[in-house]
Amino acid sequence: MWNKWAEVSRMNLKNNVELIRQKLPDLEPIAVVKDDAYGHDAAVVVPELLKNGITKFAVVYAKDALMLSEFGAEWILVLDDPPLSNMCSEYEKRGIRFCITDSKWLSDGLLELPIKFHLFVDVGMHREGVPWYETNTIREICKVVGNRLEGICSHLSNGLSDSQALATEEERFREVLSIAPEGLMVHLSNSASLYNAKFPYATHFRPGISLYGYGYPGLKPVLSLKARVIHEHILEPGEGLSYGWTWRATEPTHVVTVPVGYGDGYNRKLSNKAIAGSKAGNLQQIGTVTMDFTMFEAPKNVTVGDEIVLMGEWEGGHFWADEMAQLVGTIPYEVLTSINPRVPRVLV
């Protein structure tokens, strides 16, 4: 029996896939499962997505694409990692294709490799991609790659429909489309597609955080973080606990310890702010979160071996990644991907 684990909800994942499909029925999703499926464990998530009809996947690195093929994926797009010439037969066999993210690939000879490519155009993110204004380079890339060019894509810096940046970036992307070959897969939007107007020329989109339950009404968080109480004691009035005694008891207080800390990805900035769930309802986190342990104030009927919900929902309460993120000044993406791989992921 584990003393800490993360649960991946197959029902919530299914709900999210269905909602995304209902919202964007004319676009085929390319599921983004980078960074180990946003910390959910790609080995757990990818087979479930396949069961729900998702057949296309995207990751950042080629090594992750090779791993995904072991989980059953047969169409994988590498977003930002150059191919290796001695791996082309393996890429082809495993259905791996690559985004062209730098015009230098032309001079490096990478575009002559016998694999499929998507042209990644920088229209304003200014992070990676061939700049939209390098029209001669774009034409040359299309010519060299020829029928191995499978798609054209970009990444928006702001996907909200009322954004001036969106209007500017979409106009730039349209300019590139006007000089690109016809019949390509076209994808430039991510989970923000659920909010903004559909792009009439798009054939696909790349949902990421929405698959995992965040960013749009009706989505359900997929990952819960749980642990068992490993120690309990009564803290007397006037006594503090943990490093620096940042919390001090004003009355006899039942304290329980769980074996999760910032080494597991439970942020230290949650100290004296977080809540958790138990059979007795809400628990208040007290004292400084340490590397491997965290303490909570709890009713006396919460005892060693009891399950504590550190992230998730319970009867009468919830504390999800977006709520954690708000407390520590970050985004749910970072909360989810920070959970250490040493915490087992379990499909439920």
Swiss-Prot record:
Pathway: Amino-acid biosynthesis; D-alanine biosynthesis; D-alanine from L-alanine: step 1/1. One of its GO terms (molecular function) is pyridoxal phosphate binding. The keyword Isomerase applies. It is an enzyme of class 5 (isomerase). InterPro entries: Ala_racemase (IPR000821), Ala_racemase/Decarboxylase_C (IPR009006), Ala_racemase_C (IPR011079), Ala_racemase_N (IPR001608), Ala_racemase_pyridoxalP-BS (IPR020622), PLP-binding_barrel (IPR029066). GO terms for cellular component: cytosol. Keywords: Isomerase, Pyridoxal phosphate. Gene3D superfamilies: Alanine racemase, Lyase, Ornithine Decarboxylase, Chain A, domain 1. One of its GO terms (biological process) is D-alanine biosynthetic process. The active site is at K34 (proton acceptor), Y243 (proton acceptor). It catalyses: L-alanine = D-alanine. The keyword Isomerase applies. Belongs to the alanine racemase family. Catalyzes the interconversion of L-alanine and D-alanine. May also act on other amino acids. This is Alanine racemase. It comes from Coprothermobacter proteolyticus (strain ATCC 35245 / DSM 5265 / OCM 4 / BT). The gene is alr.
